[in-house]
Design a protein with these regions (language model features):
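Alpha-helical metal-binding/catalytic segments enriched in His/Glu/Asp
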Residues: 1-11, 98, 214-221
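Solvent-exposed residues in well-ordered beta-strands and their adjoining turns
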Residues: 99-103
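Generic solvent-exposed, charged/amphipathic alpha-helical segments
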Residues: 2, 6, 116-120, 153
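An extended, acidic, His-containing surface patch that forms the Zn2+-binding/catalytic region
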Residues: 14-93, 104-114, 122, 126-232
Length: 232
């Protein structure tokens, strides 16, 4: 199992599943420059994660790897006897939980199919492979040329006194793509938390300052959005 998983990436951390990148849209240099405008300290990033260095897909920065590039990650692996003490058993089964973060234009159903076919094909003939899909979500990127984005940018600048920089994030909010599919509307995502808030971690927290600033921003957003729609 470990050997099979290792074959899923090459030495440049490029995912080796045939067809995995076929629908990935490469960003222009201008778009990559826009991403680089966002405040980010690699040293602080490494310090927060207690790392001496970072690694990932060659040719991309850490911000790009976490925001615009698809990934394949092993979330857990186990098998055989894992209790206290020792038992000289030969494991008959081994398991791994694997997730893939997708980017716009990729399909979770298609990627699941490609993964299943490839993972099965690289298995030794002496073993059986069972892939059990759990759930998936379509990737989404909010457009920055809509009245909603203009209103959001204005609201953030009014509240915080600085023009916001749009960023792409690898977080999963599957319902956003579903909104567009079912309702035919674009979504805009406003974030008020900080990287240091440790979202989904044991010590997750959210500052009162940003809580109230968020309320203030939402008021400015709806006021500006309403004005823009009336002006059409």
């Amino acid at each position: 199992l470990c050997e099979m998983i290792a074959k899923m990436k090459d030495r440049n951390n490029h995912i080796t599943i045939p067809g995995f990148y076929d629908d990935v849209i490469e960003l222009s240099n201008e778009e990559r420059d826009d991403i680089a405008r966002a405040p980010f300290s690699l040293d602080e990033y490494k310090k927060a994660l207690d790392l001496s260095d970072v690694h990932g897909e060659e040719g991309y920065t850490t911000m790009e790897r976490t925001g615009i590039r698809p990934t394949l990650d092993v979330n857990g692996i186990w098998g055989g006897y894992i209790g206290e003490g020792a038992k000289t058993v030969i494991p008959s089964k081994a398991y791994a939980k694997i997730s893939m973060r997708l980017v716009p234009n990729q399909s979770d159903k298609e990627i699941t199919k490609l993964f299943t076919n490839y993972f099965t094909s690289i298995a030794p003939k002496s073993v059986k492979v069972k892939v059990s899909p759990h759930h998936g979500g379509e990737p989404y990127v909010s457009p920055t040329d809509t009245p909603a984005y203009t209103a959001a940018s204005h609201a953030m600048e009014t509240t915080y006194g600085k023009k916001p920089v749009p960023v792409r994030s690898g977080g999963s909010i599957p319902i956003v793509a579903l909104f567009e599919k079912e309702l035919g509307v674009k979504s805009i995502l406003l974030g008020f938390g900080l990287d240091s808030d440790a979202i989904h971690s044991p010590n997750e927290h959210y500052g009162i300052f940003n809580y109230f600033k968020g309320i203030e921003t939402i008021v400015y957003f709806f006021k500006k959005y309403s004005d823009l729609l009336k002006a059409k």
